[in-house]
């Protein structure tokens, strides 16, 4: 999958959200899958989950985002 960079949710398609911490579009399903397969963490908000999932699991990008 192509990583989609974003500044806000409007830059993302298909109902994806923009994760502010690393500016990458992500689906809720992808986030839930990450959590389910790896860890379960308490989330204060959905955005917490997105940031966590991206940084720890889904997008370990070679250029150090």
Curated annotation (Swiss-Prot):
Gene3D superfamilies named in the record: 3.30.40.170
Gene source species: Ascaris suum (Pig roundworm)
Alphabetized UniProt keyword annotations: Metalloenzyme inhibitor, Metalloprotease inhibitor, Protease inhibitor, Secreted
Function: Inhibits carboxypeptidase A.
Lineage summary: Eukaryota, Metazoa, Ecdysozoa, Nematoda, Chromadorea
Presence of the UniProt keyword Secreted in the record: yes
Cystine connections: none
Family: Belongs to the protease inhibitor I44 family.
The protein's name in its UniProt record: Carboxypeptidase A inhibitor
KW Secreted (keyword) present: yes
Any one GO MF annotation of this record: metalloendopeptidase inhibitor activity
Single GO cellular component term: extracellular region
Segments crossing the lipid bilayer: none
